[in-house]
């Protein structure tokens, strides 16, 4: 179900709690909300729809990638860029990594690891920041 985007900075500044299998429904809510905002959005974290759980979604080709309890394992090739966010007005400067490796659980609650480069890596890092309460 599509959810309203949270813009409360105090709420977004809180560190999200680990997700459990009881939170699998968030994948559908995040996917519906991402689809509804596809013209201006390429990724979401659960706190952006009002749930303080460690769940993110971002565009990765034809099918959005959903990650439960993602953990950044490694990164390389830092660079400066600017990003926007549905929860904020305008764009802001930030530092990202060209290549990252992330461990997570998928929608079947299986442990996975993925290496991302370029724009998908940038989007994933932005959403990981949301889970830590970091706002660009």
Residue ranges of model-derived segments:
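Positively charged
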Residues: 1-136
